[in-house]
Amino acid sequence: MGDTPRVVFVDTSVMTCLLDVPGKNQDREEVIPQYQQYVDGGVTMILPVTSVVETGNHIAQLADGRLRREAAIRFDRTLAKVESGVAPWIPNELTWDPAMVGRLRNSEVTGDDLVERLAQKVGAGDCMILAERAEYSERSKIQ
């Protein structure tokens, strides 16, 4: 498999492309083949709670009610597959505790802190995904 990772976290931008969320799907043609390569390669794909929340927010903010409902249905069907274990990714087990708050505030992954990341226009959702990834790495011992 060469450069194929063993574990990846599914980012919000990937979820919105896979779900074809209008206005958030501009990289869909690039994301689908990469996603399929991961599925075919047996890569463990972790679905962070932050990606679920952000994707739901993007769907809820769609102006067109018909498109909003269609995207919401796709989102719900996808989450049902995750819940039943038939989706190719698994939900990240997240404990919201002081240690997680510490990971959010001080990232070992990026080597800087929350203030610096926000000042560099890195959103809180992306910061939380990094914190979730750090927690997963600690728990699983997979880097």
Where are these regions (language model features)?
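Short, well-structured N-terminal submotif of metal-dependent ribonuclease cores
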Residues: M1-T50, H58-D76
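Short beta->alpha linker loops
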Residues: T50-S51, M128
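Generic short alpha-helical segment signal, independent of protein family or function
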Residues: A60, A80-E83
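Structural element of the ATP-grasp superfamily
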Residues: R77-T78, R133
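Active-site neighborhoods of divalent-metal-dependent phosphate/nucleic-acid chemistry enzymes
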Residues: E83-Q143
